[in-house]
Amino acid sequence: MIDSLHGEVLHVGLNYVVIECSGVGYRATASPSLLGTLRKGEDARILVTMNVRDDGIDLYAFESDEARQMFAMLRKVSGVGPTSAMAICSIFKPDEFARIITDEDDAELRNVKGIGKRTAERIIVDLKSKVAVFDSGDSASEPQSGVGGNSEAEVDSGVVGTVTQALVELGFPEKQAEKTATSAAAEGGSVSEILKRALRSMSSERN
């Protein structure tokens, strides 16, 4: 069982990273917020979990052990595959996820592409008694970076690119994804917050 990877970052892709460990390059699917912290040529240590399939083994990387635990919980829910589980982990931090489940907010879960009402309700039912371990007890939202927002000209292009890539990976058209990511980033916040804001905007446009 591979628990973590430590080595040089060889490549940071759309939704994955390649890290060289003892001469072997390991590719792991990762969230936009984690990918945003990794730089090619730098040394990094990431936590991973393995998903064994009939035709191979996939690695998924996480920023924290709590996020990895959350992924494992989601994978135990019927109908939630690794792609959907990773999409949820990419958008919600563990404490945010705990509040969503506790509040039975299936609408928030349905903002994640591929999660319908029935699956969202099943996630809530199956995990409601298990997510207390993630609840920090702080009901306040995360501090916003760039309070008061920024003009679109001042928006960090790297953040916009990361969020755009995440939206494209989730199945949204690139042009629409970039426009929405730029607008969402103008309000400030972390990559995770901006991604959630963009998803809400794109979901409302579809309705």
UniProtKB/Swiss-Prot annotation:
Location of region: Flexible linker: 143-154
Localization: Cytoplasm
Record-annotated membrane-spanning stretches: none
Pfam families: HHH_5 (PF14520), RuvA_C (PF07499), RuvA_N (PF01330)
GO molecular function: ATP binding; four-way junction DNA binding; four-way junction helicase activity
Residue segments, region Domain I: 1-63
GO biological process: DNA recombination; DNA repair
Major location (coarse): cytoplasm
InterPro entries: DNA_helicase_Holl-junc_RuvA_I, Hlx-hairpin-Hlx_DNA-bd_motif, NA-bd_OB-fold, RuvA, RuvA_2-like, RuvA_C, RuvA_C_sf
UniProt KW keywords: Cytoplasm, DNA damage, DNA recombination, DNA repair, DNA-binding
Coiled coil: none
Ranges where the record places region Domain II: 64-142
Region of interest: Domain III: 155-207
One term under GO cellular component: Holliday junction resolvase complex
Family: Belongs to the RuvA family.
Physiological role: The RuvA-RuvB-RuvC complex processes Holliday junction (HJ) DNA during genetic recombination and DNA repair, while the RuvA-RuvB complex plays an important role in the rescue of blocked DNA replication forks via replication fork reversal (RFR). RuvA specifically binds to HJ cruciform DNA, conferring on it an open structure. The RuvB hexamer acts as an ATP-dependent pump, pulling dsDNA into and through the RuvAB complex. HJ branch migration allows RuvC to scan DNA until it finds its consensus sequence, where it cleaves and resolves the cruciform DNA.
Entry's free-text remark on domains: Has three domains with a flexible linker between the domains II and III and assumes an 'L' shape. Domain III is highly mobile and contacts RuvB.
Subunit text: Homotetramer. Forms an RuvA(8)-RuvB(12)-Holliday junction (HJ) complex. HJ DNA is sandwiched between 2 RuvA tetramers; dsDNA enters through RuvA and exits via RuvB. An RuvB hexamer assembles on each DNA strand where it exits the tetramer. Each RuvB hexamer is contacted by two RuvA subunits (via domain III) on 2 adjacent RuvB subunits; this complex drives branch migration. In the full resolvosome a probable DNA-RuvA(4)-RuvB(12)-RuvC(2) complex forms which resolves the HJ.
Name of the protein: Holliday junction branch migration complex subunit RuvA
Organism: Corynebacterium kroppenstedtii (strain DSM 44385 / JCM 11950 / CIP 105744 / CCUG 35717)
Gene: ruvA
